Amino acid sequence: MSQNGATVAYAPKEAMPIGDGKDKTEVFANSIHLSLQGKGGVGKSLVASILAQYFNARGKAVRCVDTDPVNRTLFQYKALNVNRLELLREGSIDQRGFDSLMETLLTEDATFIVDNGASTFIPLWSYILENSAVDVLTRAGKRLYVHTVITGGQALLDTLHGFKSLAESTSERNIIVWLNEYFGRIERDGKSFEDMGAYRESENKVFGSVHLTKRNQDTFGRDLEEVISRKLTLDEAIKDGPFSIMTKQRLKVMQRDWFEQIDSLTLL
C-alpha cells in the first residue's frame, strides 16, 4: 500500500495474541471499527481499507465512512462505496457532525469502518468519551473496536503517545494495535512493543494486534504501488486488473496474510 507517496509491502507474520483472549469467543455481527491515531501519515487509512476489504470478503454488509477533513484517502476507493462526513465548518471542527455519525451507527445493521483524520482525532475521541457513546452503542447491541497504528522510525514515540492516550481514557478492552514496520522496527531501548511500558501498563485494554512487517520493495512494493495508484481493491486487481500472473500471485499472498491475522482476532 502507499503511505505519503511511498510503497508499503509486508511479509506474513502470525497475529500476536496480545491481551488475555477472554473475549475472543464472542461474536459481534454489527461491529464498528474506528481507525484512530493522532499522528498523520502512519498507515491509518491503510488499516481502514484493509478492514473494509476483509469484511467484504467475509460476506458482511459493510458501510465505510471517511471523516478526514484533509485527506480523503479511503473515499477514493469506488469499490468500497465510502460515504463522506463533513466535519469542518468555517475552518473549525463541528462536533455536532458526530451526532449524524452516531445516528447512522445506531440505526443501521452493518459492519462499519470509520476512517478518522489526524486533525479530528482529539475531537472525535472527546465526543465519544463525553457522550458515553460506547455505552449507547453497547445498549444497541453494537460492539466498538478502536484500531490504532504503532509505527517504527521517527514517529514511534508519537504513535505510542496516541495509543497511550486511547488506552488510558477507555474502560473497554477494545483496542486493536496495528504494528507497522514500514518506517522501521518497532523497538525502543532494545524492547519490542509487548515489552514497553506503554503496552504493559495498558495490556488489559488491548483486544489483539495485527503485525505489518515490510516485504521486498522491488516486487511486492512495486505491485502494490500500481494497485494503489489505480485506486483498486486487492480483489479488483486480482480478478480483473491488467497485471501479470506473478503480480496477482503476490497480491494474493499479501491479502491472505492480512486476512488470516484478522481472522485470528475473531471479529466476525
Region locations from a protein language model:
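Nucleotide-state-sensitive switch-loop elements of NTP-binding domains
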Residues: 23-34, 48, 57-121, 126-127
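Extreme N-terminal, non-catalytic leader segments
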Residues: 1-34, 100
